[in-house]
């Protein structure tokens, strides 16, 4: 049993059926995986999301495979998930200057169609081995028709679940998107 950091009382663990979290540019709803530790003495809750890095990797791939045009906050999310500076990201995306990445992230200039597809491919390729629960097929992006949406459009949260993964590398749990996990 865990002890409360405030009052040292015992904390009771439960699993939250749904938990919505902003990962810094992309919002996800985590299903049946978030652990909540509740202290009945001081009424404090502590929330724990397992494998946050894996959740971020799988979320980035899921967003890259969604045909809705990328916004600046999502490009920034990709870069942060890849743990890159703007200069490193520009180099990885084969861009001439880091200023281009800055313009994309600040929505000063949108990502052009060809650059957007290349960015999506690169993000998926760089993360696919780390997000074993979220498969990536390059043909999906190659055939993708990008969808324009209104500037004030707020996308629904991506629904993410823990999935059991068995492969040559290792067995274990990983993150997958709800729609992809059901398929």
Task: Name every feature range the model reports, one short phrase each.
Residues 1-68, 128, 133-148, 160-164:
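N-terminal flexible/basic segments that precede or flank functional cores
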Residues 75-88:
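Short basic helix-loop element that most often maps to the first helix and adjoining turn
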Residues 85-102:
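Short alpha-helical DNA-recognition segment
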Residues 93, 104-108, 115, 123:
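DNA major-groove recognition helix of helix-turn-helix
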Residues 113-132:
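DNA major-groove recognition helix of helix-turn-helix/homeodomain DNA-binding modules
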Residues 140-183:
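Charged, low-complexity regulatory segments of eukaryotic nuclear chromatin/transcription proteins
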């Amino acid at each position: 049993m865990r002890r409360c950091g405030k009052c040292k009382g015992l904390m009771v663990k439960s699993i939250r059926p749904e938990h919505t979290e902003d990962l810094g540019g992309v919002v996800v709803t985590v299903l049946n995986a978030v652990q909540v530790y509740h202290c009945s003495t001081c009424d404090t809750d502590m929330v724990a999301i397992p494998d946050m890095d894996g959740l971020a990797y799988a979320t980035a791939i899921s967003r890259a495979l969604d045909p809705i045009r990328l916004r600046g906050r999502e490009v920034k999310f990709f870069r942060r998930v890849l743990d890159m500076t703007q200069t490193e990201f520009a180099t990885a995306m084969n861009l001439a200057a880091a200023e281009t990445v800055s313009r994309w992230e600040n929505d000063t200039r949108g990502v052009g169609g060809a650059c957007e597809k290349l960015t999506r491919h690169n993000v998926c390729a760089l993360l696919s081995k780390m997000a074993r629960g979220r498969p990536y097929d390059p043909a999906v992006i190659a055939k993708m028709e990008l969808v324009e949406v209104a500037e004030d459009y707020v996308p629904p949260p991506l629904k993410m679940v823990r999935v059991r993964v068995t492969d040559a590398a290792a067995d274990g749990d990983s993150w997958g998107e709800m729609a992809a996990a059901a398929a």
